[in-house]
Amino acid sequence: NLVGGLVALFAFMNSSLSGAASRFIAYSIGENRGESKNVFSSLLTIHCIVAFVLVLVCETIGIIFFDRLVIPETRLYAAKIAFHISVAATAISVLRIPYNASIIAHEDMKVFAYVSVAEVLMKLVIVFLLNIIVLDKLIIYSWLYLAVVVIVTLIYSIYCIRSYSDAFALLGFV
């Protein structure tokens, strides 16, 4: 229940942040006053702060929760590793939001669809690999999921930087 609730919370948060970010970018593109680079830079800075606060809160509260959860002693190490990797994957997903929003605002849905299909296929490969691998499946799944999140984030960010002039902004510096 705890994991399911957290997943639902983060899915809602990502969806809300992405919708708001794409509105800001689309509005700045529509205004055509050359402010879209500033808007994207501001969004990237805000999402970096949100990701940092998210990691800080999750890691702090996570320590408290691990003392209260009933986890078999033999699985405690794997559960802690999976938790830390999941926090990192969530933070990277938050950092991806401005790039997703930029693609949506530029109405480049073909790229969004191709990358989404590739992401689902990579996750399917993970499921097949888990049947083959003899190591701790929870730890391996966590690392492979983090790899998928990093790969997809890199694809989105590289595509946006190459395709849109407003996406080449680094944390408040235009």
In which residue ranges do the predicted regions lie?
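Alpha-helical transmembrane segments of multi-pass membrane transport and lipid-handling proteins
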Residues: 41-70, 129, 154-155
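Interhelical loop/hinge segments that connect adjacent transmembrane helices in multipass membrane
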Residues: 138-144, 156-174
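Alpha-helical transmembrane segments of multi-pass membrane proteins
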Residues: 60, 64, 73-96, 113, ...
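Small-residue-rich midsections of specific transmembrane alpha-helices
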Residues: 1-29, 47-48, 54, 88-96, ...
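Helix-loop interface residues and adjacent transmembrane-helix termini in multi-pass membrane transporters
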Residues: 76, 105-106, 135-136
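Interfacial/gating helices of multi-pass transporter permease domains
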Residues: 1-9, 37-39, 80, 138-143
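Alpha-helical transmembrane segments of multi-pass membrane transporters
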Residues: 114-137, 151-157
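Membrane-interface junctions at transmembrane-helix termini in multi-pass inner-membrane proteins
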Residues: 91-115, 128-129, 139, 160-164
